[in-house]
Structures are given as structure tokens and as C-alpha cells.
């Protein structure tokens, strides 16, 4: 009997709710014995009377109001709920569900509603329930297939205890009784959650309407439907406690008009509710202060200094003068300014403002010195990023109490008015320039006169220098003969190499109004005027001697291979590790008036795979090609990896700023020669391969012919070769038989 009673218990018994009945009296003889299966009493077996707990435990099942407009979903969820021992009251829409809720005889324990429904939506139904004095104690669980964060937050902020995402699992429905138990436990006053107020959550401004139901009339849930911070009256079970949501018990909202004290922010130790923090980007950035307070003025001054230093560190805006209060009831939680309780004197205010201004100036000076050091290290940088600096507010501003100061880190150094040269240079640095990574860099590269280490220095020597060079006894002079400043004119790391006594005079190129673009001479007349410049490899050239020595060694090795009378030029270095084609701007400022400009420039050629040397115009693959045009200059290209010389002779073509006969696409004479050489190599390789294949096939053919001849000589009998002797004997025997027949 007792076993049968235990067997009939269901999930409701686990809640302390009995659903099965048991007999009050045990049948049998004497009222105390058991009976056998046939009905006869069993004597001699006496047991004490049993206690049926079902008589004392109230029988109750949890009633769930299921609201869903979809018939199939409603039927499936209803079946699952009934299988979990819940009593289900289905409703097709929100209006019908509200009718069931208004009828107090239904005694609904839990509401499970869909968010998106025609007519009265789930959020509207939730708002009505939360505004009702009696129905607001009923837990409301929202369910939807849309799990957008805005929709979930809006439902939970309006008072829903949970949000289920479809498809709903059976285990989730089994645990719905916990919400009812938690609500009853909190409203009875026996738990630690009693007396906790629910948080008023303002309407979100982040466009949550896009995540809401599109086919529902959700206009009536915007005004007067949000739970407030007012304490509930004592009409709820006589306990005078506030109904608690399972998730927003301590939903701290920074932009809330009512600020909470630290003791209100603390959760109970046994709280099972989550914490939701709602931030607003336009207000929360002004309130990044911890909840601490100081009652001593000295400590307050030290705290002000500390927070000013922290302001300089993180760059967060703060108002050190007035505490921002949206309502008179709001408590100021800023430790830097407790004006209502501890007003500051005017002297302390001025001192604080002066300290802030001094700190700002010191920070600006520190940043300026750092920027100066970086500029000194990167003096060869071609372009500078624009400085996005903001103004530092002054302490003597009249409208300072109404403006939130924004103390941001600036890369622009605060300079004096007397430093005109630095001011002009700083303004020019702030000008937006095109980067070296631009698509137009390969065609036009501006050379700035005020930037150190960025200009190209081309050596141009008159034709009369050859006779002067023959009189010089120094074979290799590694020192530069020009008196130009190495840093300003970009000649740092460059060398002037004189081969076989030839003296080269450096002409410092500066940007002028009338510039001549010197193009490379054409090596092959049939190809027209094409550029023979090699792609220059540019890298950062720090002001040290090691890079200069290495460059001098490379140039010296290249000069040793050159022929006498050639015009050498300076090695070019550029601070950007970028490979692109460059046109050199050479002015006729320092050149001879009657002497022609040679316009020769040495650039580094990146290594070319598959070639042992540079093939020149004259067909010589020795690495250097010598020209014979006396009046015309020669363009020399120095390879950094293998110091071979490549000279293309021709005429110097002069064009205006808008013209130019160089293609700039890498299809110059050198590229043509390289491609031609590659083509020759490929043709030779193909011919050699075909010859080898022909020889190999010829050998195979010979072997095949010999085997064929042997096969004809040695006939097969049943697929096997037969010896020649056996074959001859057979032939002789056959001849004898024929003769006998005759």
C-alpha cells in the first residue's frame, strides 16, 4: 500500500505538492493486518498504523497560461507542459490571455507568452501584467525565435523573469516551477530576498524598436508601464515587500536619474539573480569615478591631484568644478568634489585650477619632447601623419562650469611665439601630404628642401672635367669634393667615386620654379625614347658611419669595373623601404652655363634572378657597356648585390614639368635586354631538349629495328622463339618427304 502510494507520486510531490491519494485505513482483519491477494486475512502479522502525508499536504498543480498565436506551437508546448505535470490554459492572443488573468478564479501561477503576436503583443501583455496590482506577482516568461539582444533586454527590463529561445527544450519547461517557487519565497518574507526593490529601467535609445515585433501594436507599453522604484504597499500577502524580478534585482543603470548608494548596490549573499548594467555612451563617459568619499579637505586635495594625474594618463573627461546632478535628490558620488557637504574656498579652487593647468603644460611639454626625439631619429621621413590635436581648456574660462573639459593627449608641442623657424617647420609638417604608398609616387616624387635626408643628389659634371681629371694624380678619391651640407641635402651615406683620375663635381639639387626633368637616354633607337632607369631600392638612412662605409665600398667596387672618362654620381638613399620608379629632378643652378648637363644618376638595382651579369646594348655580357658619345652623358646603374655596371648611351631628352618620355612601368632598355636574354636562354634550352629527345628516340628506333629483324629471322612456334637448327632440320625433312612423294 505504501509502495503503491509512493509509486503514484509525480513531479508535483517534489514541490511539496501531492497529486496521488492513499487509503486512510488499511483493509484487513482487525483493522491492523494485511490481506492476501484472495481477500483472506493473514493472522499473526501486526504493524503500527501508517501515516499518509497526502492528508496534510495540500494538493495543487501549477497552472500555466500559454499564450501563442501559432496553433501548432501552442499544441506542442501544451503537450510538453502537460507531460511535465503542469496544468495548461492555452490562449490564442494577448487579449484572450488578459481576460483569463482578470478572472481571479483561474488562479494562474505562471504566464508563458510569445513576444510577437497580432493585436496585443507579448510585451504589451507583460506591461499590463506589471501594472496590475494583483497580477504583477505572477511570473511572466517570454519566448521567441528572435534572440536579438535588444528584444531580450527590453523584455527583461519590463519585468519578465526569463526569456526562452525557440525551439524550447523539455528540460527548460521542467524547471519553470522554480520561478513560481522563487516568487513565492520572496513574497512570503522568509528569505533574504524580501524587501528588495526592483529597478526602474529607462527606455533604451539604441533603436530597440527594430528588434521588436513588427506585427504587434506595441504603442501602449511605452508610457506608464515600466516598474518604478517606489516601494510596494503592504497589500501583497501582508509582508510589505517588493516583487522581485529574477534578473534585474540589481540592474545598475549609470544614466539613471536616481543614483544608488554602495549599500544598495550590494546583492544579498544567496541571490540567484543576474546583474544587468545599462550604459549610455553620451553620459557614462563623464562619470568614471569610484564610489568613495573623503571628509578631510587635505585628503580631498590629494585625491584631486591623483585624479588629475589619472586624467592625464587615460585621457578621460572629468569636471573638477561642479558635480553633475540631474535631480536634487541625487547623491554625488564623486570623491573629487563634494560641494554640497564640503564646499571649497575660492583660493583652493584657484589653486586646483592652476595645478590642472600646470599639469596640462607639463604633459604637453613631455609629449613635445618625445615628439622632438622621434623627429630627430626620423629626420629622413618623407611624409608625416597629420596631427589630430585638441585644445586644452584654460583654467580662467568663464564658461568652465558648463563645459566638460576634454584633456586629450596631443602630439603637437606647445611652442613659444618667438620660435619662428620651428613654428614654420611645424606648420609645414602638419600639412597633409601624399604618402609614399600612393599610386602617383612612382611617377612624381617631390623633393622638399626643408626635410633632411630626403633629396636625391645627382652628380652632374661638365664635359671639360675630363681634361681636368687627367691632370689629377689621385686614382680613387673616396671623399666628396662638394661643399654641400650632408644632412640638409641628403648626401649622407653617399660617396663620390672617381675612377682612373676622373674628378666629379657634385651639383646639389634644390627644388626651383623652373625644373628640368632629365630623362634617361635611349639605348636602342628602334624602341623609341624609353626610360632606362632601374627600380631603386630605398631604405632608411640613419646618420651613422657604418651605412656610409658600406655604401662607399659598394660604389668603389663598382667604380673599379668602370672605364675611364665615365661620369660617376652619388649613391642614392631614401628613408622608405619601398621599390618604385623615380624620375630625378636636376636643376641647372650650379652647372656650367656653356657646358651641357649630363644628368647621370646611380641607383641601386635589385638582384635579378636567372642572370649572372647585366647584358648591355652592344651585346657585351661583361657587365659594363662603354659609350662613345662625347657631348652626351651616360646613365650608370649600380647593382647592390653584384657590382656590375650597365651603361646606356644616347641623347639627353629634356621635357617640361608635364611631359616626360619615360614609361615608368619597368619596360625600359634594361628590361628589354633582360627579357631578350631570357628568351634566348629559353630558345637554346628548347633546342637542346629537342636534340636530346631526338637522339634518345633514334636509339630507341635502332633497337626496335634490330629486334624486328631478329624476330623475322627467328620465327615463333606457339609464341616462343624456335632455334634456327630445329627450323632448318624441319625444312630439310620436309624437302625429303616431298622428293619421296615424287
UniProtKB/Swiss-Prot annotation:
<feature type="compositionally biased region" description="Basic residues">
    <location>
        <begin position="697"/>
        <end position="708"/>
    </location>
</feature>
<feature type="region of interest" description="Disordered">
    <location>
        <begin position="590"/>
        <end position="671"/>
    </location>
</feature>
<feature type="compositionally biased region" description="Basic and acidic residues">
    <location>
        <begin position="331"/>
        <end position="341"/>
    </location>
</feature>
<feature type="region of interest" description="Disordered">
    <location>
        <begin position="186"/>
        <end position="249"/>
    </location>
</feature>
<feature type="compositionally biased region" description="Low complexity">
    <location>
        <begin position="618"/>
        <end position="634"/>
    </location>
</feature>
<feature type="compositionally biased region" description="Low complexity">
    <location>
        <begin position="719"/>
        <end position="731"/>
    </location>
</feature>
<feature type="compositionally biased region" description="Polar residues">
    <location>
        <begin position="236"/>
        <end position="248"/>
    </location>
</feature>
<dbReference type="InterPro" id="IPR010402">
    <property type="entry name" value="CCT_domain"/>
</dbReference>
<dbReference type="GO" id="GO:0000160">
    <property type="term" value="P:phosphorelay signal transduction system"/>
</dbReference>
<keyword id="KW-0902">Two-component regulatory system</keyword>
<dbReference type="GO" id="GO:0009736">
    <property type="term" value="P:cytokinin-activated signaling pathway"/>
</dbReference>
<keyword id="KW-0805">Transcription regulation</keyword>
<feature type="region of interest" description="Disordered">
    <location>
        <begin position="375"/>
        <end position="402"/>
    </location>
</feature>
<feature type="region of interest" description="Disordered">
    <location>
        <begin position="478"/>
        <end position="570"/>
    </location>
</feature>
<feature type="compositionally biased region" description="Low complexity">
    <location>
        <begin position="490"/>
        <end position="502"/>
    </location>
</feature>
<dbReference type="InterPro" id="IPR011006">
    <property type="entry name" value="CheY-like_superfamily"/>
</dbReference>
<feature type="compositionally biased region" description="Polar residues">
    <location>
        <begin position="503"/>
        <end position="512"/>
    </location>
</feature>
<feature type="region of interest" description="Disordered">
    <location>
        <begin position="290"/>
        <end position="346"/>
    </location>
</feature>
<dbReference type="InterPro" id="IPR001789">
    <property type="entry name" value="Sig_transdc_resp-reg_receiver"/>
</dbReference>
<feature type="domain" description="CCT">
    <location>
        <begin position="682"/>
        <end position="724"/>
    </location>
</feature>
<keyword id="KW-0090">Biological rhythms</keyword>
<dbReference type="GO" id="GO:0005634">
    <property type="term" value="C:nucleus"/>
</dbReference>
<feature type="compositionally biased region" description="Polar residues">
    <location>
        <begin position="380"/>
        <end position="390"/>
    </location>
</feature>
<keyword id="KW-0539">Nucleus</keyword>
<dbReference type="Pfam" id="PF00072">
    <property type="entry name" value="Response_reg"/>
</dbReference>
<feature type="compositionally biased region" description="Gly residues">
    <location>
        <begin position="656"/>
        <end position="667"/>
    </location>
</feature>
<comment type="similarity">
    <text>Belongs to the ARR-like family.</text>
</comment>
<keyword id="KW-0804">Transcription</keyword>
<feature type="compositionally biased region" description="Polar residues">
    <location>
        <begin position="318"/>
        <end position="330"/>
    </location>
</feature>
<feature type="compositionally biased region" description="Basic and acidic residues">
    <location>
        <begin position="299"/>
        <end position="313"/>
    </location>
</feature>
<dbReference type="Pfam" id="PF06203">
    <property type="entry name" value="CCT"/>
</dbReference>
<feature type="region of interest" description="Disordered">
    <location>
        <begin position="697"/>
        <end position="742"/>
    </location>
</feature>
<dbReference type="GO" id="GO:0048511">
    <property type="term" value="P:rhythmic process"/>
</dbReference>
<dbReference type="InterPro" id="IPR045279">
    <property type="entry name" value="ARR-like"/>
</dbReference>
<feature type="compositionally biased region" description="Low complexity">
    <location>
        <begin position="186"/>
        <end position="195"/>
    </location>
</feature>
<comment type="function">
    <text>Controls photoperiodic flowering response. Seems to be one of the component of the circadian clock. Expression of several members of the ARR-like family is controlled by circadian rhythm. The particular coordinated sequential expression of PRR73, PRR37, PRR95, PRR59 and PPR1 result to circadian waves that may be at the basis of the endogenous circadian clock.</text>
</comment>
<feature type="domain" description="Response regulatory">
    <location>
        <begin position="63"/>
        <end position="181"/>
    </location>
</feature>
<protein>
    <recommendedName>
        <fullName>Two-component response regulator-like PRR37</fullName>
    </recommendedName>
</protein>
